[in-house]
Amino acid sequence: MAITLRQSDADFEQRFAAFLTTKREVSEDVDAGVRQIIARVRAEGDAALIDYTQRFDRADLKSLGIAVSKQDIAAAYETADPKAIEALEFARDRIRSHHERQRPKDDRYTDATGVELGWRWTAIEAVGLYVPGGTASYPSSVLMNAVPARVAGVERVVMVVPAPGGIINPLVLVAADISGVTEIYRVGGAHAIAALAYGTETIKPVAKIVGPGNAYVAAAKRQVFGTVGIDMIAGPSEVLVVADGSNNADWIAADLLAQAEHDVSAQSILITDDPAFGKAVEQAVERQLQTLPRGETAAASWRDFGAVIEVATIEAALPLVDRIAAEHVELAIDDAEGFLSRMRNAGAVFLGRHTPEAIGDYVGGSNHVLPTARSARFSSGLSVLDFVKRTSILKLGPEQLRVLAPAAIALAKAEGLDAHGRSVAIRLNM
């Protein structure tokens, strides 16, 4: 049973603060082991990948090959469900259409002194996409990472995916193909991250790595950061639903369980101004748990990390929503637009009673790679902007240099950097 927090209780602030700091992941001390893996991949290249893949995934890359071939991809189309392929293509088109609107524009202008300033955007040359294997192997996540990269203009999009027993989910391969992935390798874990960062005989290095993974993958991304860029360190999924008593309790329960079924560490939270409705949702959750194939996982998530928060008014929920800063926020209330206008922190917001978060996971068009663990307070979801970089531009002529030079020389002198001042003065015979 999820916990219940009542804003009217005297100890609410203390309990709510404790709730915000609840740790949902068991931290494994894997840094030392990951450091060894990275060092070995840097030293031994493909040989290390082959050995680690045999050890961890029971797959023989000597016979299978490290790279996934065109024939492998063609075979994936033959074995994948045609309806699922059609749905992936539908989702791909919507994701592409939305992300094309995110392309930033270059700018050049001349200020009052005649100085030209501006910036230009260029795509990152090569990006690596990590895709988890096994039960966490989601074709939709391939689309969400690869499509924005291609829209941004990234020429080389490299996917690494573990192949337990030599098998890769065929829909993952189809998703990679239809979204423009240019290379696919059947390696996973920290050794795959090392290969993307430093390269091997088969895998050329990339400039940035995106995509979720387990504790080893997360540690590897942290350790290679600086050599390459990374997107984020993603934690367990989470949803916060703000709902009044006008909602269908079964709908809201289904939304809460849609997150809870992801992982035992996922978190589902309901904030309501109607205690009776909150109880009805809890009862609906218990009923629906009995019918879910992943009911055991969802039940553990709801029991350990779920919450129902009772507030006096929907307006009183606003500061709590901003403090929680959830990955997903559903606003199933009458004035969802007005509430949104006063909100600050959320990875993504789903407005109204007919916008379940699951639509955003698949076919809404917006990206489902979002900040978790309250990091929406300072970061954003994945977008085209994650795959481009901005270069500033400055242009002066002799007249503009004469105008700006005195202040530049004075600042260089104040900072004790004489060569800086000289590089300006020498052009003006000063």
Curated annotation (Swiss-Prot):
- Record keywords, A-Z: Amino-acid biosynthesis, Histidine biosynthesis, Metal-binding, NAD, Oxidoreductase, Zinc
Q: Does the keyword Oxidoreductase apply?
A: yes
Coiled-coil stretches are none
Catalytic reaction list: L-histidinol + 2 NAD(+) + H2O = L-histidine + 2 NADH + 3 H(+)
The protein's Enzyme Commission number:
1.1.1.23
**Cofactor(s) it depends on:** Zn(2+)
Q: Highest taxon of the source?
A: Bacteria
What does UniProt list as catalytic?
327-328
What does the record say about how the cofactor binds? Binds 1 zinc ion per subunit.
User: Which NCBIfam families did the record assign?
Assistant: hisD
Q: What does this protein do?
A: Catalyzes the sequential NAD-dependent oxidations of L-histidinol to L-histidinaldehyde and then to L-histidine.
Supply the PANTHER family for this chain.
HISTIDINE BIOSYNTHESIS TRIFUNCTIONAL PROTEIN, HISTIDINOL DEHYDROGENASE HDH
**Family listed:** Belongs to the histidinol dehydrogenase family.
Protein name, please? Histidinol dehydrogenase
State the gene name recorded for this protein.
hisD
